[in-house]
């Protein structure tokens, strides 16, 4: 999911790499690897919980963790955004592998499926995952991480490789990612762990082979945001029409019970006429900014998203974000296509009323 700020979206990972020092420790492989949810009395989430959410490693991580516990009755899975993979190793961000967080989530009946992003760009990643030896080393590193704590699986969130306009590279990445997910998911399943894949929303075949992923993965998380993003023109992060398009394609290619559509708990602040990228705001920051500047709240019915404008130092700013009203407007589209699974980017970012909206209240 810029990643320190926005954390997600098409350019998000790339900006993260320039904004964050990625010198986290290697995952300790000697740590005891208990089976998922093996503590006495632990009952991991059942199918009555239809939500998942990502837990950031920056900001007020304790508040984000408490947010998960407070809404444990709606969450079957939390994915701490803890790891990133290079060609043959996995590094942890600050706080990665926090056993207090893992144990606390398990006690609440929530699965812990950490997210792994990738650092290689599209061309390098294609080389890694197309080569059997290098692909095996990459999978080994992911499995080493998965076994280092009592994790319930792995969430593979590889977005850097999707950032290519070269058709040949894109096709090589697509074919290689199919091989990678085939191998990784099979080996995770052999260990009794889940294989989750997070993907960009697509309205047709592209880097991610939805049909293949729907066969090998336990769940496919579709990021239902950044239709307009920090490096582009101002506009809604998502829209009803766009949801219709990608849901139609997703449900044609992936079993409905494996699909999760993630909603944003953030927004973008575009300065009109200014060079550079839009600033990132969580819902809480956007709501506070609107109130501080006295801006009027507007809701765009066509997209199902709120927005407002304000002036700062003579420059007009346009802010688009998402709140509970917007989620309530867009959620029926998931139901229309028979999709029950939802996700949230990210814990601690969101409008508190989103949880009620997700319940249909």
Sequence positions of predicted segments:
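Glycan-recognition patch characteristic of GH18 chitinases/ENGases
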Residues: 37-144
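Short, well-ordered coil/turn segments that N-cap beta-strands
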Residues: 47-49, 74-76, 108-112, 150-152, ...
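A cross-domain feature marking catalytic cores of carbohydrate-active enzymes
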Residues: 55-57, 82, 114-118, 158-160, ...
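Conserved, mostly hydrophobic/aromatic
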Residues: 78, 156, 220, 261, ...
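Substrate-binding surface in catalytic domains of secreted glycosidases
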Residues: 88-96, 140, 162-292
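Glycan-binding loop/region signatures in secreted carbohydrate-active enzymes
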Residues: 263-332
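Acidic/aromatic/glycine-rich contiguous surface patches that form carbohydrate-binding/processing clefts
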Residues: 330-361
């Amino acid at each position: 999911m810029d990643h320190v700020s926005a954390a997600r979206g098409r350019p998000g990972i790339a900006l993260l790499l320039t904004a964050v020092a990625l010198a986290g420790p290697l995952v300790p492989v000697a740590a005891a690897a208990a089976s998922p949810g093996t503590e006495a009395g632990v009952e991991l989430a059942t199918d009555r919980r239809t939500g998942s959410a990502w837990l950031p490693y920056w900001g007020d991580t304790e508040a984000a963790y408490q947010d998960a516990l407070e809404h444990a009755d709606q969450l079957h899975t939390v994915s701490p955004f803890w790891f990133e993979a290079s060609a043959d190793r996995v590094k942890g961000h600050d706080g990665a592998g926090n056993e207090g967080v893992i144990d606390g989530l398990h006690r609440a009946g929530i699965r812990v499926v950490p997210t792994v992003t990738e650092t290689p760009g599209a061309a390098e990643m294609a080389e890694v995952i197309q080569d059997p030896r290098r692909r095996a080393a990459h999978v080994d590193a992911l499995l080493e991480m998965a076994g280092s704590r009592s994790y319930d699986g792995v969430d593979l969130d590889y977005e850097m490789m999707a950032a290519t306009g070269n058709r040949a590279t894109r096709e090589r990445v697509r074919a290689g990612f199919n091989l990678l997910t085939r191998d990784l998911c099979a080996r995770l399943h052999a260990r009794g762990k889940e294989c989750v894949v997070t993907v960009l929303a697509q309205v047709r075949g592209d880097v991610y082979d939805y049909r293949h992923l729907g066969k090998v993965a336990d769940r496919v998380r579709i990021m239902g945001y950044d239709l307009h993003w920090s490096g582009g023109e101002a506009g809604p992060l998502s829209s009803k029409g766009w949801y219709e398009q990608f849901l139609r394609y997703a449900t044609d290619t992936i079993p409905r019970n494996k699909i999760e559509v993630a909603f944003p708990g953030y927004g973008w602040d575009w300065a009109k006429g200014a060079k550079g990228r839009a600033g990132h705001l969580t819902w809480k920051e956007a709501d506070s900014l609107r109130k501080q500047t006295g801006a009027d709240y507007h809701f765009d019915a066509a997209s199902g998203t709120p927005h407002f404008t304000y002036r700062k130092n003579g420059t007009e700013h346009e802010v688009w974000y998402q709140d509970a009203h917007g989620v309530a407007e867009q959620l029926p589209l998931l139901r229309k296509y028979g999709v029950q699974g939802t996700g949230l980017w990210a814990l601690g970012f969101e409008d508190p009323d989103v949880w009620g909206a997700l319940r249909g209240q």
